[in-house]
A protein has these predicted regions:
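Helix-adjacent hinge/juxtasegments
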Residues: 58-98
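Short, contiguous alpha-helical
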Residues: 8-65, 106-157
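Active-site rim elements
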Residues: 7-8, 71
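Short Lys/Arg-rich basic patches
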Residues: 2, 6
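Short acidic/polar alpha-helix capping motifs at helix-coil junctions
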Residues: 48-50, 95-100
């Protein structure tokens, strides 16, 4: 599997599991913390893409704001994901592995590869998905099995 396919597969898994998670969040009474965390995942995708494309507004973009209404999360998630799918699909492995620069939290000049930023977004999503799964469980709802292997393995006998 080449790098482009790997990253697209990772984003696809992340997309599927986050949308399943939204279905569970819909069942709980106190959604506030899950909404904040899910909004943060959306905002992170927007901010990191803005950094990659050298958007001058990237520095002012918040990791945590806006906090979307629950009913907006699915649509906003998809909107935040699409630029990543487009960017990865249009990029070569060499481009995905070449450093881009951006202004960091401390106004310093930082560098990272788009590949590593893409992986960060997906791994970061796993971290916050686990937090949301815990919140769901604490409110008496059994979370779905969303492990990556569950999308890949097959029973033979």
């Amino acid at each position: 599997m080449n790098l482009t396919d790997y990253l697209l597969d990772t984003f696809n898994y992340n997309d599927q599991t986050n949308k399943k998670l939204l279905d569970k969040i819909n069942l709980i009474d106190d959604k506030n913390e899950c909404i904040k965390l899910f909004s943060h995942l959306i905002n992170s995708q927007y901010k990191w893409m803005a950094r990659i494309i050298q958007d001058p507004k990237a520095k002012e973009m918040s990791w945590w704001e806006p906090v979307y209404n629950f009913v907006e999360l699915n649509c906003e998630w998809t909107k935040s994901l699409q630029p990543w799918i487009t960017y990865i699909t249009a990029s070569t492995d060499e481009e995905l592995s070449s450093e881009v620069t951006f202004i960091g939290f401390d106004d310093g000049l930082w560098a990272a590869t788009p590949k590593d930023i893409a992986l960060q977004l997906n791994y970061h999503s796993i971290h916050h998905r686990a937090q949301m799964q815990t919140i769901i469980r604490q409110q008496g709802i059994e979370p779905d099995f969303i492990d990556y292997i569950g999308t890949k393995y097959r029973k033979l006998s």
